Amino acid sequence: MKNLVLSFLIIFSINCFSQDTITTAKVNEYMDKEVCVIGKVVSMKLASEGKSTNYINIDKPYPESVFTVVISNRYLETLNLKLEDLMGKIIYTKGKITIYKNDPKQIPQIFNPISIVVKKE
């Protein structure tokens, strides 16, 4: 059973890395495509009471953000991770690159990513 779980994790990791794994500097080139973005979590805004959206800024903090991971509280439960534990870590985020239509800064984002994996040190 342990080998089966280990095999699954390896296959999942290979799947993320075998796709286009890009840095935040290249996200604009992959608009509306599903990719795996690598970068360091430098700041975040967690949903306050009455709010339901969390923002994780990768490589540069807000307001100089170059890429943001946006996760709703409901969806966060399916990812099974604590956002606070990601601060300062390098992560792989898999999902579709989009831009929120009402964002005046037009910052690329992944909304409710398929997966977030912390890079092993």
Model-derived regions, located:
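OB-fold single-stranded nucleic acid-binding module
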Residues: 19-121
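Bacterial Sec-dependent N-terminal signal peptides
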Residues: 1-20
